[in-house]
Amino acid sequence: MVGLPDSAVKESHQRILSALQVTGYKMPTSNIVINMAPADIRKEGSSYDLPLAIGMLAASETISSQKLSRYMIMGELSLDGTIQPIKGALPIAIKAREEGFTGLIVPLQNAREAAVVNHLSVYGVSNIQEVIEFINDKHELTPTTVQTREEFYACQSDFEYDFADVKGQENVKRALEVAAAGGHNLIMVGAPGSGKSMMAKRLPSILPPLSLGESLETTKIHSVAGKLGRNSSLISQRPFRDPHHTISQVAMVGGGSFPQPGEISLAHNGVLFLDELPEFNRSVLEVLRQPLEDRRITISRVKSTIDYPASFMLVASMNPCPCGYYNHPTKPCVCNPGQVQKYLNKISGPLLDRIDIQIEIVPVPFEKISEQRQGESSAAIRQRVIKARPVSYTHLRAHETDSYLV
């Protein structure tokens, strides 16, 4: 096998051999040379198992090759011949349509994800026997269909968290509403238990809904990273990513030997929430400066350069001091001025300059929390946010077009 295959691709020989034996087929006894072109790009992952197996059977004339020119085939093989899900099914489907293929054969779990692409018949298969019989015209596969637009719009308002659950904090809610309307970055400073994380988790519920074009772009990123759930189609809600403060620089911005999207790209068109901001490594925070300006991240390697979109809304929270009770109305702070200053200096000035709204949060009194009256709902706030956007959601829906979607 030539053409810069990685170890996973090289190991496909054993998986293919076992899968074919289980289904009653044998590998050709002669030496086989497989050239994976272009030779200067490294091939990675196990998604080549199924096309390699089918290609070898066709080359040895064990199966018919008449249909193969019309179909792109991708999938990982298990030792028993079953087909496992792969990463990047949606970008693969888009590429298949661009290259003029009429059909795409993928693992059953990836079929709905790929089927959002129009003018392309997508077939989900669960084992290699189904593929062989389909190619030999002994078995018909049913194309997977997805009602893309109906499903997309039906799930746009189904949120787990709602601002109606938040008691008090009207000034913070107003700040979050302004941030949502303008796409501004925001930092909340307050004592532990003042509701910073609770309100941040509810921010996606008041952001304007995704357009179909934004959803396609967001779904492609999550597909490449392998973050889509099984049997998923388009992402219908804005992403909310909240990495732990121990995250590495590569995990935040993306990279690795085979560059993958990082948290800032997974938060594209959504929210990146950094809880306890000063606890993050200084180098991790500093790499956010360029993506916050350019709205994309460039990952450079010796052989290639990859651009990932990173247009996210940064929301951060932090305590005002190491003990957390500086300026607290009832609890005393035990930190000296030097400790407070050292704690605040963990966040650089250039990064703070990129955070448009900085607000202090005061804990809500018990009497306010115990009230029966609910706060304003996310749906009501969201309507005001949509109206405040330069281009309303109604205008977006009337003009959104994406030639790839069903």
Describe each model-derived feature in a short phrase.
Residues E140-V178, G213-I264:
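P-loop NTPase nucleotide-binding/switch module
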Residues V189-A225:
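Walker A/P-loop
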Residues M1-I187, A191-S194:
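Peripheral, non-AAA+ core regions of ATP-driven protein-machinery
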Residues K331-I361:
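A short helix-turn-beta junction within AAA+ P-loop NTPase domains corresponding to the substrate/partner-engaging
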Residues P259-Q260, S265-N269, S300-N319, T330-K331, ...:
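AAA+/SF3 P-loop NTPase mechanochemical coupling elements
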Residues E286-V302, I306:
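Conserved catalytic/switch belt of AAA+ P-loop NTPases
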Residues P261-L292, Y326, L351:
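Conserved AAA+/SF3 P-loop NTPase catalytic/coupling segment centered on the Walker-B
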Residues T394-T401:
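Conserved small/polar residues in nucleotide/adenosyl-binding loops
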